[in-house]
Amino acid sequence: STERSWVSRGAHKLIGALDAFDVSPEGRRCLDAGASTGGFTEVLLDRGAHEIVAADVGYGQLAWSLRSDDRVIVMERTNVRELTAEAIGGPVDLVVADLSFISLATVLPALTACASSQADIVPMVKPQFEVGKERVGAGGVVSDPELRADAVLTVARRAAELGWHAVDVTASP
């Protein structure tokens, strides 16, 4: 069979996580924090999400096919640190996040504020934004396995402080 063409490679990252964690967006209201071109949003739609709030600090990045879908609420020029359930039209049942140039640990309180009490969160941890600039190697890569693990633990601890329970961790494909 032929491989589906997605709007971005981000789609493969979310597919891997949803499958690894057995999380289904079907029938759920979702928040895609850091939507960019919409790879995560496209997967959520493909897997039956009822509605997706696609939030990003950028402007004009979301693919037209997603922007024009009635199930997608586009929130551009939006700092996800300032999101609230009220700002996005009510709480969501699933939060997915693929953020750059910001620590996920600092954004988790806002993502939590947007989530219903029964929500799931599937965040993409990027070590280069969690460990501090002084610990990031050439090209913005954190290659030390201990530092990478520390980044995941930092985010997991912050999530636990906010009432989340880490189910599992998986590497991005």
Task: Enumerate the predicted regions with their spans.
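S4-like RNA-binding module at protein N-termini
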Residues: 1-23
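Conserved class I S-adenosyl-L-methionine
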Residues: 26-36, 44
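Residues at the N-terminus of the alpha-helix immediately C-terminal to the conserved SAM/SAH-binding loop
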Residues: 36, 40-41, 58
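Conserved S-adenosyl-L-methionine
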Residues: 43-51, 164-173
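S-adenosyl-L-methionine
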Residues: 50-106
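A short glycine-rich, Lys/Arg-flanked "PGG" loop and its adjoining helix->strand segment in the class I
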Residues: 105-122
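Conserved beta-strand signature within the Rossmann-like core of class I S-adenosyl-L-methionine
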Residues: 118-132
